[in-house]
Amino acid sequence: MADPGFSNLDPHTAQVEEAEKDLSEGVMGLVAPNKKPGEVIAKLASSRMFILQEASVYALAAGMEKNPGTFAVGVVNDEDKPVGIVLRRELFDNLGRMYGRDLYKRKLVPELMKTPQLIRDDTSIFSVADNLAEELRKGTSIYYVLVDGSGHYSGIFSTTDLLIYLSNITARDISLARRLQRAIVKECFSFAGERTSIVGSSAMAKEVGGDFYVVKRLTGGKLLIAVCDVSGKGIAASLITAVLGGFFDGYTASNSVKSFVRKLNRYIIDTFSLEYFVTGIIIELDEGTGEATVCDLGHSYMLVVEQGKLKRLGSDASNPPLGVSPKLEPATGICRLNPGSSVVLFTDGVVDQTDSSGHDYTEQRLWRLLKASGGLPPQQLSTKLTTDLASFRGDAPQRDDITFVVMQYC
């Protein structure tokens, strides 16, 4: 659709003929694309069009009508330095008003231009985003004129251009974070040891989350099993799960649970400066004897079913979450699993899931399910728990990440 105020003019009027003459004489043009390396603001220039300050308003309107995708034009002097900016919307609003065509028929561009806000075109995009944080929150397009190191005009960008760029960056980051997290935290996992059968499951509430679990075979007939929950959501939480994955991957039988926890706690504090914490349960299991060294880090979601009876498995000692206390001296407990027992480790996303009426799934419901199904093989028990959660939730959205590990000791 043509812009009002100019396209409705008689194309044979003297003003339009004069405008065409101005255009043919080069009063309006495009600067060359800026090819500066790196993530600089020049990359976001959505308009490279300029017009000389001595040009007529009609010449500007003619040029913009020929370039319908241009929303702003820089006004430059004879040294190619910007002296103003004209927005397409404001230009044609003025020309479209009553008597607007007559009012501006002899006017020059400076009558309509605004003083430009200048930004160096080699400035980092992220630095510009930081400086314009308040403007970005306003939700309206604000235009800025770019200049090179000599002050010459090199284009125009808007806060909308910047928001689109940042949105694309965020989308790519989330996609990368999701791939990274899924490489570390599998949606489904199964493991068969000498005397254990284990199934793991993790379903994120969003694209990325903060739940983590690991099952690792160690030398000497031992297993490492852990379930952790990172505070917060999103990319930051997924970054911490990557840290956890790296640490647990380096765990060996020569480690002690206590020394491992101390090192991991120190790293989380040094890296994330007490901004995030991690609850979790870490178990080192001797498959031959059934002896389990348990370190409960402010988590406590660990249940064991033996001969139809359900109890909470854990240490009497209390530990804070990882990343809270720089001087953490972890306490561990020892328990022994009997053949035929089942152990379930889970995150709070299981019991905190709500139905469409806002009622929680609750730990009591989980207890009932486990007491009735504790003798099932891990895969069947995992399927039953997943099905029951889905049935309970109904149309309600998944509230939090849901992660659990089911182990049967034979």
Task: Please provide the spans of the model-predicted regions.
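Short, low-complexity N-terminal regulatory "tails/caps" that precede and couple sensory modules
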Residues: 1-48, 148-164
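Juxtadomain coupling helices with adjacent low-complexity linkers
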Residues: 2-5, 10-12, 126, 136, ...
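Bateman (tandem CBS) regulatory domains
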Residues: 34-49, 104-117, 248
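Signal-transducing coiled-coil linker helices
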Residues: 49-56, 121, 172, 190-193, ...
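The conserved cystathionine-beta-synthase
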Residues: 50-70, 76-77, 95, 119-141, ...
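Short beta->alpha transition motifs characteristic of CBS
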Residues: 74, 81-99, 152-168, 298-300
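… and, occasionally, acidic/histidine-rich disordered N-termini of signaling adaptors
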Residues: 169-338, 342, 396-410
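Active-site-proximal, acidic helix/loop segment immediately C-terminal to a metal-coordinating Asp/Glu
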Residues: 235-254, 313, 337, 341-396
